[in-house]
Amino acid sequence: IDNRITLSDQLPSSVVTPIFAGTPYANIQSAAFYTNIADTRTDGFELAGHYQLELGGWGRLDFNGGYARNNTRITGLDDVGSIPGNQIIGRNTQGLIEDGTPKDKLTLSANWLYDGWSVTVAQRRYGEWQSRNAANPALDQTFGAQWVTDLDVSYRFDLGLTLSAGAINLFDSHPDKLEGAQLYGVPKYSITSPEGAQGAFYYTSVSYDF
């Protein structure tokens, strides 16, 4: 991608405050803006498969699987000048582009269909990813792989009514915590973790087809 659009680094108050002085935005202490000065290249591959198994009088099983592996690197940064003491796209932002998402992802699912029943189990695995410190490589952190399981059980009645119950992230999986970072004494999670840090979500639902 040439001229890829991405957010800049966060500009500190020493840069931002003088710019907004005397305006309604004088209380702003930091800012970032969109820029398109980076050129990137992504290489990788994706695989997908499907298999259907008939169970005779016990319905049918549908299996699906997928695997994707990608690598993105910055091939060039346009020279558009600089802000004293700051980089427009610095080490942290470059890390978000190159290492901020998992290098690979695996998805597996099985769906059992029998009369009005439908039971689906889905599994996702996110590979390792990294967060770079803006100034100190020694503070970079590599986050381990994460497995997430979903479950949905539903029954459809003849009249069009469907009852469902299930869970997203059934086993309450969480990503690795940020090393040394806490908010009010509670360990923090990275905002770029692929599955978030909300944990398990359980639900029931009712739907009707007219």
Regions flagged by a language model, labelled:
Residues 92-96, 139, 186, 191:
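Peri-catalytic substrate-binding/gating loops that frame the active-site cleft of hydrolases
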Residues 35-40, 140-143, 193:
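Outer-membrane beta-barrel proteins
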Residues 40, 113, 146, 156-158, ...:
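A short, compositionally biased micro-patch
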